[in-house]
């Protein structure tokens, strides 16, 4: 006798590969939830992976300099907000480029674009908004940091295409 397993359909508006009851599902206004899910705000590990090296570098620079200032706190906050926004922009870009693939994979079919929660146009607008906000934050940094951040966009842009080989 064949054993069949049934994977339950995800709840309306949720993403099947995210933890249930996350902060986006519990606290975010309903109209923002698909966009926050598109940015993977319900899964903070990617933001931490961007943010912790930034904070570590800042801490080392402050120790080397021997003093801290209020400006350093703004840089710490700017790194946090920038990491959140750029991680979100990268995930949004990934979902835009993989939209035709995601719809045919059970793990990703419930993501906002293939499930119809967000249109491609809406996702592009969300991507531009996140990038513009992050760029505004980037302007508080020096030219060397700005150049490094701009250079880091290359792997983000090609990543969705590189994983197809």
Language-model regions, residue ranges each:
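The first (N-terminal) embedded transmembrane alpha-helix
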Residues: 41-60
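Cytosolic, membrane-interface loops and tails of multi-pass inner-membrane proteins
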Residues: 11-33, 91-118
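Intramembrane alpha-helical segments
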Residues: 32, 36-37, 111-165
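Hydrophobic positions within alpha-helical membrane elements
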Residues: 47, 92, 100-103, 107, ...
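Hydrophobic, aromatic-rich alpha-helical transmembrane segments
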Residues: 31, 35, 40-47, 68-76, ...
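Short, intrinsically disordered terminal tails adjacent to the first/last structured region
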Residues: 1-15
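Membrane-embedded alpha-helical segments that form the functional core of polytopic membrane enzymes
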Residues: 54-97, 107, 131-139, 145-159
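Residue-level detector of alpha-helical transmembrane segments in integral membrane proteins
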Residues: 1-3, 37, 46, 153
């Amino acid at each position: 006798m064949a054993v069949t397993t049934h994977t339950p359909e995800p709840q309306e508006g949720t993403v099947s590969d995210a933890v249930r009851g996350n902060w986006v599902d519990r606290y975010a206004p309903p109209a923002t939830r698909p966009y926050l899910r598109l940015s993977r705000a319900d899964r903070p590990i990617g933001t931490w992976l961007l943010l912790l090296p930034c904070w570590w570098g800042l801490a080392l620079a402050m120790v080397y300099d021997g003093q801290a200032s209020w400006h350093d706190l703004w840089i710490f906050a700017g790194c946090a907000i920038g990491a959140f926004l750029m991680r979100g922009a990268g995930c949004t870009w990934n979902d835009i480029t993989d939209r035709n693939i995601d719809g045919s994979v059970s793990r990703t079919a419930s993501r906002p674009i293939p499930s119809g929660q967000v249109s491609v146009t809406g996702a592009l607008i969300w991507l531009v908004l996140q990038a513009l906000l992050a760029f505004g934050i980037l302007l508080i940094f020096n030219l060397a940091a700005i150049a490094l951040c701009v250079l880091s966009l290359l792997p983000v842009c090609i990543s969705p295409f590189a994983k197809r080989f």
